[in-house]
Curated annotation (Swiss-Prot):
Native source organism of the sequence: Anemonia viridis (Snakelocks anemone)
Keyword Disulfide bond: yes
Location(s), subcellular: Secreted; Nematocyst
GO cellular component entries: extracellular region; nematocyst
Expression (tissue specificity): Moderately expressed in the ectodermal tissue from the distal and proximal tentacles, body wall, and oral disk.
Alphabetic keyword roster: Cleavage on pair of basic residues, Disulfide bond, Hypotensive agent, Ion channel impairing toxin, Nematocyst, Neurotoxin, Potassium channel impairing toxin, Secreted, Signal, Toxin, Voltage-gated potassium channel impairing toxin
SS bonds (residue pairs): 37-72, 39-65, 55-73
Protein name (Swiss-Prot/TrEMBL): Kappa-actitoxin-Avd4g
Family designation: Belongs to the sea anemone type 3 (BDS) potassium channel toxin family.
């Protein structure tokens, strides 16, 4: 019984370590939480940010158009 309990504890600890490592990688993952969108009069595809009043910083957005209550942000 003690060996089985010890084995379960080891497996649980290993799962916690691997889950924490995966979360650290996810924090630095280079992806945006935006959907594709298109604005009339603008070439290419923009990023649709849902329920935002302005474009978030750090992504290089230079122009936008509003699609109420969302905003479509263009990087070029």
């Amino acid at each position: 019984m003690n060996k089985a309990l010890f084995l379960c504890l080891v497996v649980l600890c290993a799962a916690v370590v691997f889950a924490a490592e995966d979360l650290q990688k996810a924090k630095h993952a280079p992806f945006k939480r935006a959907a594709p969108c298109f604005c009339s009069g603008k070439p290419g595809r923009g990023d649709l940010w849902i329920l935002r009043g302005d474009c978030p910083g750090g992504y290089g957005y230079t122009s936008n158009c509003y699609k109420w209550p969302n905003i479509c942000c263009y990087p070029h």
